[in-house]
Curated annotation (Swiss-Prot):
Keywords tagged on the record: Chromosome, Nucleus, Telomere
Protein name: Protein FYV6
Compositional bias annotation for Basic and acidic residues: 16-26, 58-68, 98-108
Primary site of residence: nucleus
Positions of disulphide bridges: none
Gene Ontology CC terms, in alphabetical order: chromosome, telomeric region; nucleus
Superkingdom as given in the UniProt entry: Eukaryota
Region (Disordered): 1-30, 48-68, 98-154
UniProt organism field: Candida glabrata (strain ATCC 2001 / BCRC 20586 / JCM 3761 / NBRC 0622 / NRRL Y-65 / CBS 138) (Yeast)
Purpose: Involved in telomere length regulation and promotes fully efficient non-homologous end-joining (NHEJ) by a mechanism activated in postdiauxic/stationary phase.
Family: Belongs to the FYV6 family.
Feature: compositional bias, Polar residues: 125-135
Biased segments, Basic residues type: 140-154
Length: 154
């Protein structure tokens, strides 16, 4: 609250400064008490105002915390783009693996069709003669149900 200046005036014809200052203080005191009576709130009003003030403070603090935890539009867009890129990469790798599986199956079928063991009914092992005359055994090992692998042993 701003402090009000005390009334300082000297009435005409009075030379007694002490009495004049006492009168000024009395008048100033009366003015102050009257002002306080007008400004003074009831207990109910004071409690209500205090509750409103605390609620506003609480709302401000919770808004600050929410603002800190909330992602901005740029951050949201960035994370959506990351997710989109991740999905595209997964699709690309899935297609790559499908293509490689197809190539593998094609080579496997070619090897099986050339194999003399085809008639004996052994699809797991293959033998073939190379130019140097050595015999190699090709063994199919299924490590993953979706991707069998060829292992060549001499």
């Amino acid at each position: 609250m701003s402090e009000e200046k005390k009334l300082q005036f000297v009435t005409e014809g009075q030379a007694d400064v002490e009495k004049q200052s006492e009168r000024e203080e009395a008048i100033q005191g009366a003015i102050e008490t009257e002002r306080k009576k007008r400004v003074r709130k009831t207990l109910r009003d004071q409690l209500r105002a205090n509750a409103i003030k605390k609620q506003k403070k609480s709302n401000r603090e919770s808004a600050e915390v929410k603002k800190l935890n909330q992602l901005s539009k740029e951050e949201t867009r960035y994370f959506k783009e990351l997710e989109k890129n991740r999905e595209q990469e997964i699709q690309r790798l899935t297609q790559f693996h499908k293509d490689k599986d197809y190539e593998y199956e094609k080579k496997r079928q070619q090897l099986l069709s050339r194999s003399p063991d085809k008639q004996s009914g052994k699809p797991d092992t293959l033998s073939s003669n190379q130019n140097n005359g050595s015999t190699e055994r090709v063994i199919l090992k299924v490590k993953n149900k979706n991707r069998p692998r060829l292992v060549v042993k001499k």
